Amino acid sequence: MAGFTMSLNLLLLVAMVATNILSLYHLSSTTNFFQSTVKSSQSSVPTVPDHLLRQLHTIRAAINHLTTHQPDKSTSTSTSRAAVSSSSSSTAPKELLIYSKLSPIASACHNYPDLLHEYMNYTPFSLCPSDTDLVEKLILRGCHPLPRRRCFSRTPRNPSDSKPESNVLWSYYSCKSFDCLITKFSDLGFDLSLEKSKSQFSAYKSELDLPISQLLQIAKSANSVLRLGIDVGGGTGSFAAAMKARNVTVLTTTMNFNAPYSEAVAMRGLVPLHVPLQQRLPVFDGVVDLVRCGRAVNRWIPVTVMEFFFFDLDRILRGGGYLWLDRFFSKKVDLENVYAPMIGKLGYKKVKWAVANKADSKHGEVFLTALLQKPVAR
């Protein structure tokens, strides 16, 4: 098809060039004829030679014929898209087709049709497939919120408050108990004791630390009340648990990366928000007093994505609210040239700004702890 189109275009080009040459020849002949006869007769009108008329007529007819058979690009493209759409619709699961008529589906979902079709390929009114990994893949790729399904989510068989492990479906994860997670990944916060959470945010060991007591005192001195907060990438909800003991409600955004983070947050009587960092936070404008960004917010996030992220945090923060960057990790040169200017665009007051070198740094990596206050009014 591509070769035929190229040959057709070449033939059209040759025909057009030939037409132009004959036209120039005709004009030249006509001009000479006028110059030779102008003295003898001012009113005589030259006639076009018959052979030129026949050649021009033949070429124009050929051009019209070729143009008529030349496929229109816009029509061809739309037809192709319609064919693809039709093909996709014919292979899409029935439940996906039904839901798509009821509610819009995130545009990013259509970029991963295989994953989306696998997710929506289930038996209605029965148990949902065991597809936690698939859910995480779709959400991380921007397919959020996911389409709703008419199936029953799987739950543990014998949940018990006295046995935390019984409240988790461990088949999705490499570890099969909280003890395993605590032993293998001691820094991930799966020791769910309140004492552990309190001690984690009460000690002051370096300039990078910001104990909760100091945070509350700063807010009190500024006549600012802390009632509602969000911990972005808050893991198992340790910060939210410590703030709950201070009568401050904190929502925790988290993803289940090979561990039951959301379940751990919920078992503490806290609210887990299962949302990715690249998506708009499901919170109304200007209602949050505090946003904390933990280990999940670091240099691995693309710069433009991070800029949109910071301005989304600004959207939900009330005037006078606080943004706490807790150990933001990057190279020192990037902090100075990229991230500090980006943060500066928010126009926040620097209540605390502490930078320290990473202990085992080999490439100039540093940590930043910053407490920033949003202007009361814009």
From Swiss-Prot:
Topological domains annotated Lumenal: 30-378
Keyword annotations: Glycoprotein, Golgi apparatus, Membrane, Methyltransferase, Signal-anchor, Transferase, Transmembrane, Transmembrane helix
GO BP terms: methylation
Protein name listed in UniProt: Probable methyltransferase At1g29790
Stretches in topological domain Cytoplasmic: 1-6
Ranges of Low complexity composition bias in the record: 74-87
Keyword Transmembrane: yes
Disordered: annotated segments: 67-87
Domain of life, source organism: Eukaryota
Membrane topology term: Single-pass type II membrane protein
The EC number(s) this enzyme carries: 2.1.1.-
Localization per record: Golgi apparatus membrane
One Pfam family named in its UniProt record: Methyltransf_29
PANTHER family: EXPRESSED PROTEIN (PTHR44067:SF5), S-ADENOSYL-L-METHIONINE-DEPENDENT METHYLTRANSFERASE SUPERFAMILY PROTEIN-RELATED (PTHR44067)
Family: Belongs to the methyltransferase superfamily.
Enzyme class, UniProt record, top EC level: transferase
Glycosylation (residues): 247
Originating species: Arabidopsis thaliana
Presence of the UniProt keyword Methyltransferase in the record: yes
TM helices/strands, residue ranges: 7-29
